[in-house]
Amino acid sequence: MTGLFQLVSSYSPSGDQPAAVQKLVTNFHAGIAKQVLLGVTGSGKTYTIANVVEQIQKPTLVMAPNKTLAAQLYGEFKAFFPHNAVEYFVSYYDYYQPEAYVPASDTFIEKDSSINEYIEQMRLAATKALLSRSDVLVVATVSAIYGLGAPEDYLSLRLILSLGEHIEQRQLIRHLTELQYTRNELDLVRGSFRVRGEVVDVFPAESEMEALRIELFDGEIESLSLFDPLTGQTVRKLQRFSVYPKTHYATTRERTLSAVDTIKDELKEYLELLYGRNKLVEAQRLAQRTQFDLEMMAEVGYCNGIENYSRHLTGKAPGEPPPTLFDYLPPDALLVIDESHVTIPQIGAMFKGDRSRKETLVEFGFRLPSALDNRPLRFEEWEVRSPRSIYVSATPGSYEFRESAGEVIELLVRPTGLIDPEIEIRPVATQVDDLISQINACIKLGDRVLVTTLTKRMAENLTEYLSEQGIRIRYLHSEIDTVERVEIIRDLRLGKFDVLVGINLLREGLDMPEVSLVAILDADKEGFLRSTSSLIQTIGRAARSVRGRAILYADKVTRSMRAAIDETERRRQKQKEYNAENGIVPKSVVRPISDILEGARDGVEVKSKGKGRRVDEVPADYGALNQAEIAAQMKMLEQQMYQHARDLEFEDAARIRDQIQRLREAGLG
């Protein structure tokens, strides 16, 4: 089923938003390929894009630079489009150690990974939505440029079921196993099916909560329905349903056997090359590893590391780019690149790092040369595959300006009337003493302070010194994982401490209305952390407070500082003029402090058959868990949920299911 994008919001566009939406939509319909949306912090860039999506009515891919921002955008778009398919496509690895070889120490490191099955389910849901409906918006990271199964294989393998269709049960089961579904008569879990008489139950790999029941009679589909796999309760009847493969890498038996033949040919050719170079150890190693993989593929259809043979499985020529999420997009889709000044350089860097590691594996006989084609897209390949695009940033880079050829739409006026922070320059010599007095002044007003330094050592020393002065302060460093980072930011907003010190973690996507002062130490030291873009982004962290200020501690004004100050002043001037013309009095953003890690903090009291009552052990504070541990916790709870279902304790099973759902949302952070 497909419909139209329907934006749900209690607000209507204001400030620069109506003009920006109109211009972006007009340019899109005119066929303009690249546009820039230059939007200041708090100007409603996400809401503006949501309005554009509603008006153009095209499938949309939104790319973010990291999982944290992707999760934030996913939540916002999900709220804007509750009746449409808003999907999430990020790396499904909680932990990933790629295979590698270190020649200097003759050390081979085996691939080791931990897959988050909930993220995998969301990835499958994203590709299914792209192939089956037009009202779909996918939020992704650079994971979107990595190799995926070919969409034509994914589509050709699907099992299309219709009411009244003739299909033998044995034929149905065979097709499900080709889709890599496993038969499980005890637990109907995601990616499995069970057979009871003439009823076949299937739990689609991309489904979050609903399973499919196929009722046959005399070789004919008599009934199709979705049901709750926990309670068995029917959710709704269906006329038609498509079961998609359990994995993006599923392929036909014929294609697999064909790939085995071409891999054998490549192996023979490369072994001759290695023997010719007198690399006997490498040749023996390669022959042994590859022959084992070939036997596994011929017998069971897959092997560990099968992605290294993806070129053979997809029938691509050597050097051809792999199929990616971009191949699932229709030609008329819209691509939105959020924080483009960070995301675009990331896209260019992915290929180079991947290539050097694999070249070493090939050279020393751990992989065939075709493994080099299991890779992310090169930057130029990504450019070719990108549909019409909008680059969104407060500080677009030179690439975005060049590609958009002057099509820059500005979003400088905030709906709240807030103006950009006032900037002051103060001397370096007295920066610490001055900073203490500024912090104390902010604390008296109940405000918070962000301080950014150049080095880790300076951040640590400053944190220690200010703490000795009685200031409640925390240090946000690169070793802190995503979940703990969110907890620290929440604690700052709650007032558990007043000052947050960081190096390069205080720029994009931090929404803290309580922060009224940003202090940038050693602002005159030119470099990546003190570039024009970095300075503007950091200054913008104080833009959600009516008392927002930025202090740059510097002995001279560098070119980057001058550009950042001039641009901020230009924006302030336009914002002041708009407020004066419309009689708007600036007021700070008021945003509730929601605990995104809430839920599942309390023990769930349930009954265990024959064992009296028990309380399932649930950690009191998920801030202490990383994403891998959260995934393990969800897996444990899921096992308990299915046990309750088998014991016919459906209320208890449903309660744990709700807990898993809250945990899953927390894990997206």
Curated annotation (Swiss-Prot):
Disulfide bond positions: none
Molecular function terms from GO: ATP binding; ATP hydrolysis activity; DNA binding; excinuclease ABC activity; helicase activity
Residue span, Helicase C-terminal domain: 431-597
Subcellular location: Cytoplasm
Main location: cytoplasm
UniProt domain UVR: residue ranges: 631-666
Known partners and oligomeric status: Forms a heterotetramer with UvrA during the search for lesions. Interacts with UvrC in an incision complex.
Name of the protein in its database record: UvrABC system protein B
Encoding gene (name): uvrB
